[in-house]
Amino acid sequence: DNAVHLGDVYNNSGYPFIDAGNGGSIDGIIAFCEGTLAQINKDTVVVPGHGPLSNYQGLADYIAMLKDIRSQMMVLIDAGASLETILNAGITKAYDGVQGDPGLLLNRAYFSLTHKVVDR
Protein backbone atom coordinates (compact mmCIF):
# COMPACT_ATOMS: atom_id res chain seq x y z
CA ASP A 1 0.00 0.00 0.00
CA ASN A 2 2.80 2.42 0.86
CA ALA A 3 5.74 1.68 -1.41
CA VAL A 4 7.73 3.40 -4.12
CA HIS A 5 10.09 1.85 -6.69
CA LEU A 6 12.94 4.04 -7.88
CA GLY A 7 14.55 1.69 -10.39
CA ASP A 8 18.18 2.32 -11.28
CA VAL A 9 18.06 5.87 -9.89
CA TYR A 10 18.45 4.38 -6.40
CA ASN A 11 21.15 1.74 -6.07
CA ASN A 12 21.22 0.43 -2.51
CA SER A 13 24.16 -1.90 -3.15
CA GLY A 14 26.66 0.40 -4.83
CA TYR A 15 27.10 3.77 -6.45
CA PRO A 16 24.47 4.73 -9.05
CA PHE A 17 25.09 4.61 -12.77
CA ILE A 18 24.68 8.04 -14.32
CA ASP A 19 23.75 7.73 -18.00
CA ALA A 20 25.56 10.97 -18.79
CA GLY A 21 25.95 10.06 -22.45
CA ASN A 22 22.17 10.21 -22.82
CA GLY A 23 21.50 13.33 -20.75
CA GLY A 24 21.60 11.82 -17.27
CA SER A 25 23.32 13.77 -14.52
CA ILE A 26 24.18 13.62 -10.87
CA ASP A 27 21.95 16.69 -10.46
CA GLY A 28 19.06 14.82 -12.09
CA ILE A 29 19.45 11.84 -9.77
CA ILE A 30 19.57 14.12 -6.72
CA ALA A 31 16.52 16.12 -7.87
CA PHE A 32 14.49 13.00 -8.64
CA CYS A 33 15.33 11.41 -5.29
CA GLU A 34 14.55 14.64 -3.42
CA GLY A 35 11.22 14.90 -5.22
CA THR A 36 10.40 11.32 -4.28
CA LEU A 37 11.44 11.88 -0.67
CA ALA A 38 9.07 14.85 -0.46
CA GLN A 39 6.17 12.60 -1.52
CA ILE A 40 6.74 9.68 0.86
CA ASN A 41 6.69 9.26 4.62
CA LYS A 42 8.59 7.38 7.29
CA ASP A 43 6.41 4.27 6.77
CA THR A 44 7.02 4.02 3.02
CA VAL A 45 8.89 0.97 1.73
CA VAL A 46 11.48 2.20 -0.77
CA VAL A 47 12.34 -0.36 -3.45
CA PRO A 48 15.70 0.37 -5.08
CA GLY A 49 16.68 -0.84 -8.52
CA HIS A 50 19.51 -2.80 -6.90
CA GLY A 51 20.07 -3.94 -3.34
CA PRO A 52 17.87 -4.59 -0.34
CA LEU A 53 14.62 -2.82 0.44
CA SER A 54 15.04 0.57 2.04
CA ASN A 55 13.00 3.27 3.71
CA TYR A 56 12.65 7.04 4.06
CA GLN A 57 15.87 7.40 6.07
CA GLY A 58 17.82 5.18 3.67
CA LEU A 59 16.78 7.35 0.73
CA ALA A 60 17.57 10.52 2.71
CA ASP A 61 21.04 9.15 3.48
CA TYR A 62 21.58 8.27 -0.20
CA ILE A 63 20.68 11.83 -1.21
CA ALA A 64 23.02 13.26 1.44
CA MET A 65 25.86 11.06 0.13
CA LEU A 66 25.31 12.17 -3.47
CA LYS A 67 25.09 15.83 -2.47
CA ASP A 68 28.30 15.52 -0.45
CA ILE A 69 30.15 13.90 -3.34
CA ARG A 70 28.79 16.50 -5.79
CA SER A 71 29.77 19.36 -3.49
CA GLN A 72 33.33 18.07 -3.11
CA MET A 73 33.58 17.50 -6.86
CA MET A 74 32.47 21.06 -7.62
CA VAL A 75 35.13 22.52 -5.32
CA LEU A 76 37.74 20.59 -7.30
CA ILE A 77 36.19 21.31 -10.71
CA ASP A 78 35.95 25.03 -9.92
CA ALA A 79 39.66 24.93 -9.05
CA GLY A 80 40.39 23.42 -12.48
CA ALA A 81 40.83 19.80 -11.42
CA SER A 82 40.97 17.10 -14.06
CA LEU A 83 39.06 13.85 -13.79
CA GLU A 84 42.30 12.12 -12.80
CA THR A 85 42.74 14.56 -9.92
CA ILE A 86 39.17 13.94 -8.78
CA LEU A 87 39.62 10.17 -9.01
CA ASN A 88 42.68 10.41 -6.76
CA ALA A 89 41.30 12.97 -4.29
CA GLY A 90 39.56 10.44 -2.06
CA ILE A 91 36.28 12.35 -1.98
CA THR A 92 34.24 9.14 -1.76
CA LYS A 93 36.44 7.45 0.84
CA ALA A 94 33.78 7.66 3.57
CA TYR A 95 31.36 5.69 1.36
CA ASP A 96 33.58 3.27 -0.58
CA GLY A 97 33.48 0.56 2.10
CA VAL A 98 29.75 0.16 1.54
CA GLN A 99 29.31 1.43 -2.03
CA GLY A 100 32.38 -0.08 -3.70
CA ASP A 101 34.51 1.32 -6.51
CA PRO A 102 33.63 4.97 -7.19
CA GLY A 103 35.43 5.20 -10.55
CA LEU A 104 32.40 5.00 -12.83
CA LEU A 105 30.30 7.30 -10.64
CA LEU A 106 33.04 9.93 -10.56
CA ASN A 107 33.66 9.64 -14.31
CA ARG A 108 29.98 10.03 -15.21
CA ALA A 109 29.38 12.75 -12.59
CA TYR A 110 32.42 14.65 -13.91
CA PHE A 111 31.02 14.44 -17.44
CA SER A 112 27.55 15.52 -16.30
CA LEU A 113 28.99 18.53 -14.45
CA THR A 114 31.58 19.62 -17.04
CA HIS A 115 30.35 18.09 -20.33
CA LYS A 116 33.95 17.01 -20.97
CA VAL A 117 34.32 13.55 -22.48
CA VAL A 118 37.09 11.63 -20.76
CA ASP A 119 38.08 8.07 -21.61
CA ARG A 120 38.72 5.89 -18.60
Regions found by a protein language model. Name each.
Residues 38-43, 52-120:
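Accessory terminal helices/loops
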